[in-house]
Amino acid sequence: SGEANAAAAALGAAGAEAVGTSSSGVSVVRTGTSRVLFQFDGGAGVSLVVRPGLEDGVKTVTHFRGYRYYGDFQYQRRSGGNLTVVNFVPMEDYVNCVISREMSNSWPLEALKAQAVCARTYAAMNRNKHSSNGFDVCGSTDCQVYFGTAWTGTNTARAAEETAGKHVWYGGRMAQTFYFSCDGGATESVGNVWRSDVDMPYLKGVVDPYEADVASQIEKYTSTVTFTKRELKELLHSKNYMCADVVDFRVTETTPTGNVLTVTVFDAAGKSWSFSKEKARTFFGLRSQRYTISGSGAGYYVNKDGVLPSMSGVYAVNGSGNVSQVPSGSMPYVVTRDGIARMEGEAASGNTFTVTTYGWGHNVGMSQWGANAMARRGHTYEEILKFYFTGVEVR
């Protein structure tokens, strides 16, 4: 531009001419204006780094999109791509920031310490997760939520400092320290949610007797969602499952800790569709892997009072004298004074199914609210971690 050429001439660069940048170009402009301060070609290892100065030993911060961060910032643009902004931050500063967002500075110190060790171990184990994008971990729930120093405080800083360098180990290797908000009464084995637990035996489901202590403080600890038969049919159609009218929707298999393993939808044509593990939660948009379904179209019969009680738990004797439970949702035949008749099923709640969920999250690893409750009872951070991660060491 003319302004740039004039500036070059003023610097004694006679005959110099300003030219535009390539497809990897980066322009630095003054905030709130269109004035270009300088430009450079990014890519090929070239980037802009902003490093805060030191002020008498006080840790300084850099502002980015309304938040404050420790450490340096790198701005790099790969050919034709968007600008990639990377925060280079010491591990313990990163841990301090993560736990302040994942929990709260006001929580018990031992719970914050447990979260600090989880966050540090997770970061170390997943350091190359986004290496193809030019950084280690992201700041979203895909990795760990990270918004800089906004929620840090004395307790979060202390939790990071007093556990500095500590990780969770199993069998000589660092563990995958997954965590989530609250379990509703029990965590779950990783093999019943995502994948085989052959190489992660420490991620076993445990019944949680602690979390109930703080359940009243947890927003939507118990929540409900309702589906009509039409809504379920439309949901399946939207996912390319061509079902007829829905007649039943129920949990068909649970895990040893009482969480849902499989849920099944039945239609009027006699077909069924089962969804297992995490898909049993995410397909229906549920908050937790721990839930119940009421108002299903399981078998009912009319008693002498004209009431429709469920046939769940009813047993029958077959022609060979063997006793077996009548499957929920079946439509068995009975002998009446007028001959053989089929017992027609009728949903107790008409066309509506109510799903009641307990807790929030995938249920694998450490319950954050459970850690809170354990800390309130006087448990140390190591005891918390060893409760939620079976057979591990902290060192």
Residue ranges of predicted features:
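Conserved, single-site charged/polar hotspot
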Residues: 1-395
